[in-house]
Amino acid sequence: MLKSPLFWKMTTLFGAVLLLLIPIMLIRQVIVERADYRSDVEDAIRQSTSGPQKLVGPLIAIPVTELYTVQEEDKTVERKRSFIHFWLPESLMVDGNQNVEERKIGIYTGQVWHSDLTLKADFDVSRLSELDAPNITFGKPFIVISVGDARGIGVVKAPEVNGTALTIEPGTGLEQGGQGVHIPLPEGDWRKQNLQLNMALNLSGTGDLSVVPAGRNSEMTLTSNWPHPSFLGDFLPAKREVSESGFQAQWQSSWFANNLGERFASGNDTGWENFPAFSVAVTTPADQYQLTDRATKYAILLIALTFMAFFVFETLTAQRLHPMQYLLVGLSLVMFYLLLLALSEHTGFTGAWIIASLIGALMNGIYLQAVLKGWRNSMLFTLALLLLDGVMWGLLNSADSALLLGTSVLVVALAGMMFVTRNIDWYAFSLPKMKASKEVTMDDELRIWK
């Protein structure tokens, strides 16, 4: 067996495939590094503009002072504690128009969005009488609107409460801080009638836009020019339309679904960042780095199919290929992925794939013309390589059926090999015959292959 040319041929080809794994892994490392560079650019854009935004509010914040007594030893001692009681709206409606623009640093781009939001909230303050007690004193209330990054707050029109324009102040006005704005309510008995708040807010950010459905019943409608939204958070849109020109989505929720009425318990530590929210993220569809990385996962399949085609060609013809020729063709297939990565950063992934495929086919076509001693066989292999590139492109663009397509390719390739080699006597398989006057021994065949 160890002297069999077929054994050594299969062993050498297997070793060549394993050897080609080294440059493939190096290329995958380059892909990771380039993706990290792109992430650094996105972080730089985020640091120079504003980050993800999570809007909470509007809420009425009521400072409360409560007197209570405790028993200490033989006497009763009066104590006092202060906290903020948050009064949530009966209904909250948010209507937004989002415009996404791309910022570029070098060859990398990131997305920054600008949203014009209209907030409408109705507060039933008459029910605050439930909190009245002799030992409770209310302070001056104010309306709170919290955001994730105050740097993204742009133009804020004067809010109106029951038709009266009020002033708006920076900061949440809460002791625990937080980023946002607050609106002091006017002097007087503000509890005499329900409050209706209307305000417009320009908010910018990167990544996610989230709105906490604080109302007993909450609705949000958002229209955007970005065609690649990612709907995140705790609630999917009740309605959504996505097209090449952008998207429109509508969310609905109530306290029955989100339990926010109880979660906004009295106290200063509200943990708003963990509250459920309507969310949408401005994302990039599978970018060139993700697609190139996925493509490299099929590299071994491409190399194996090419080597298998060469092996069948050797088996059916008198032409013999040296292991170095296998290796050079394999390296050209590996270089396809590095060329694809480099081109995709400038031309886009589709254009890069076409150019890299044509360059690889041309390079192999010219080389195989000399190796296979003619243009006919060279053109057949070149067309086969282009066909394989097309199959790989189909695998990358059909994520849901990639397993089915990949399996089909392997089955067809194996069936084709079985068909064309069905009449071969593998025991009698040998290298091309030498001159008739000289007997061909097994050692001769093994020496020629090696």
Regions found by a protein language model. Name each.
Residues 2-29:
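Hydrophobic alpha-helical transmembrane signal-anchor segments
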Residues 7-11, 104-111, 183-189, 291-301:
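Membrane-entry segments of alpha-helical transmembrane domains in multi-pass membrane proteins
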Residues 24-28, 285-295, 394, 398:
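Glycine- and acidic
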Residues 27-51:
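Alpha-helical transmembrane signal-anchor/signal-peptide segments
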Residues 36, 40, 47, 61, ...:
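Soluble non-transmembrane domains of integral membrane proteins
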Residues 46-71:
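Short extracytoplasmic
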Residues 274-303, 322-323:
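Cytosolic-side membrane-insertion boundary helix
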Residues 300-450:
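Generic detector of multi-pass transmembrane helix bundles and their immediately adjacent loops
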